[in-house]
A protein has these predicted regions:
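Catalytic alpha/beta core domains of metabolic enzymes, predominantly
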Residues: 175-178, 185-301
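Short, small-residue-enriched loops and turns at beta-alpha junctions
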Residues: 13, 17-18, 46-52, 103-105, ...
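A mid-to-C-terminal "edge-of-domain" accessory segment
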Residues: 3-4, 8-10, 251-416, 453-456
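N-terminal active-site wall of soluble small-molecule enzyme domains
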Residues: 48-67, 73-76, 80-85
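Alpha/beta enzyme core
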Residues: 4-6, 16-42, 62-63, 67-68, ...
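Mixed-charge, glycine-accented linear interaction segment located at domain edges/termini
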Residues: 469-471, 475-504
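Short beta-alpha connecting loops at secondary-structure transitions
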Residues: 107, 225-233, 245-257, 315-321, ...
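Non-catalytic terminal/interface segments that mediate subunit docking, oligomerization
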Residues: 16, 29-30, 35, 364-482
Length: 508
């Protein structure tokens, strides 16, 4: 199986995503995670743009040097004589990715220079960088349109580059305009005409970045540029997870990337960048490992009839079955098994009917809700733990405080707490009563698109207990109340699950 190299540009091109800015700490965290996952090289930033960028490059190169990975760190630089090369060297990096013009139109319009003048400027920059110990790769920006509109320019420029001490020529579909077949044709021409190492740098404007990248490899490109979650300008760069898995499964092209790290990397970059992958994104999307149809759950139970090679466990995830109105008994059975509870066929049917009823009402049912629904359906006791009242004190310069009135099996009691925020105060008040609360893993607030201040918000909180994750949700116009209600569902989930376990033990 042929192995392709992968260069990740989440920290450089990915930071050009509107609204995305990384701190030096964040860049270091992401760079470490990428390199530990087997990425061949990481482009960590651009020369000269800010002192914060310089700090990030210094810290990343210091870490890389101590882990024998300095040659895997790359920085974008410009055709500016000595400035970019000096900046990169002063901040500890050894590799300059030099941005040049891959189309005559860009050369003449943006630089106001002739092709000959541009090549002379490139020669001066490359020669200086090389003499000062830097490895130089050269980006051909807008190469795709250069090949389409003036191939002679591209060939003449590349012929000039071939005489210089450069390691790679990086072919850019800057505006994402190529088809896979055009990509293959253009890359093959470059590969056949020049004895150079070629990278392909794709963009996803037409949704073809992954396909174009694979066809570039087929034509002779040895390294592909990617970004985690497809971050980048406009529609983004080639998606790391989709590229690696598609190349292996469908084209027999392996990489050094650890597939089990893909979900972790996606979550890490999403959390830091604030840009979530689409819910149904291949490999890493929130619902991409969820089967929604009861027929599919039944087929998987009987013979894995609806599973392909994209087993979620390959990527550090697990398969699950949705609890909506298209669910079936197999969906119920699977989720109960995941929760470690056994219920009778009659209870399964009653639970399925309730799930479908809620689905018709557009209510999202989580796996943890099964416990609460079973309690509502079959228990004669009043619902376990209730939040009867709450009073928050919020004053400038003082920590938020809360006084709670709770009821547990008809017994009323109070709890108080203060914290860094109102929800933190609420949690600390609960911990004063329930010391063994599960670990809060993830907290998300979603707001409807009505565009009004009174729009409903949904709190989605993920918890960990006994090594297992579960999620609770609640909806309210006030996001704090939504979060508190989701937390109360967590308390009742734990309480009712304990009751079910006791009942099952008593029967045996």
């Amino acid at each position: 199986m042929k192995t392709i190299e992968v260069m990740d540009t989440t920290l450089r091109d990915g930071e050009q995503t509107p609204g995305v800015n990384y701190t030096a700490d964040e860049k270091l965290i992401i760079a470490e995670a990428l390199l530990r996952s087997g990425i061949d090289a990481v482009e960590v930033g651009s020369a000269l743009i800010s002192e914060g960028e310089a700090d990030a490059v210094r810290r990343i190169t210091q870490w890389a040097r101590s882990h024998d990975a300095l040659d895997k760190i790359e920085v974008l630089g410009f055709v500016d004589g000595t400035r970019s090369a000096d900046w990169i060297a002063q901040n500890g990096c050894r590799t300059l990715n030099l941005l040049t013009k891959g189309s005559e139109h860009h050369c003449r319009v943006q630089l106001k220079k002739t092709p000959e003048q541009h090549l002379q400027d490139i020669e001066r920059t490359v020669t200086y960088a090389h003499k000062n110990g830097l490895t130089v790769n050269v980006y051909l920006e807008d190469w795709s349109q250069g090949m389409r509109d003036c191939e002679d320019y591209v060939m003449a420029l590349t012929a000039g580059l071939a005489k210089l001490p450069i390691k790679r020529v990086m072919l850019c579909d800057t505006l994402g305009v190529l088809t896979p077949h055009q990509t293959e044709e253009y890359v093959r021409k470059m590969h056949e005409c020049f004895k150079l190492r070629f990278d392909f740098h794709g963009h996803n404007d037409y949704g073809l970045a992954v396909a174009n990248s694979i066809f570039a490899v087929r034509a002779g490109a040895g390294r592909i540029h990617v970004a985690m979650n497809g971050l980048g300008e406009r529609a983004g760069n080639t998606n790391l997870a989709t590229l690696v898995v598609t190349a292996r499964d469908l084209y027999g092209l392996s990489s050094n990337v650890n597939e089990r790290a893909l979900a972790m990397l996606s979550d890490l970059v999403a959390g830091i960048s604030g840009v979530e992958p689409s819910a149904n994104a291949p490999i890493v999307g929130r619902i991409s490992a969820i089967q929604g149809c009861g027929v599919h759950a039944d087929g998987d139970k009987k013979g894995k009839l609806y599973q392909n090679r994209l087993d979620p466990t390959r990527f550090g995830r697990k398969r699950s079955y949705d609890l909506g109105k298209t669910a079936g008994l197999a969906s119920i059975e699977h989720n109960c098994k995941e929760l470690g509870i056994e219920i009778t066929p009659e209870q399964q049917r009653a639970l399925l009917a309730k799930v479908k009823e809620l689905g018709d009402q557009k209510v999202t049912v989580t796996q943890a809700d099964i416990i609460l629904l079973l309690h509502d359906i079959f228990s004669a006791k009043e619902n376990g733990i209730k939040l009867l009242d709450y009073h928050f004190t919020l004053k400038k310069g003082a920590p938020p405080k809360v006084a709670l009135q709770l009821c547990h099996d008809k017994r009323k009691f109070e709890a108080r707490g203060e914290g860094d925020g109102q929800y933190d105060a609420f949690i600390k008040a609960l911990r004063s009563v329930y010391a063994d609360l599960p670990e809060l893993v993830d907290y998300r607030i979603g707001i409807s698109r009505k565009g009004t201040s009174g729009a409903l918000t949904e709190a989605t909180i993920t918890w960990r207990t006994d090594g297992k994750l579960f999620t609770t949700r609640a909806v309210n116009p006030d996001q704090l109340v939504a979060a508190m209600n989701a937390t109360m569902r967590m308390l009742n989930y734990i309480e009712f699950k304990r009751e079910l376990s006791k009942a099952a033990s008593a029967q045996t």
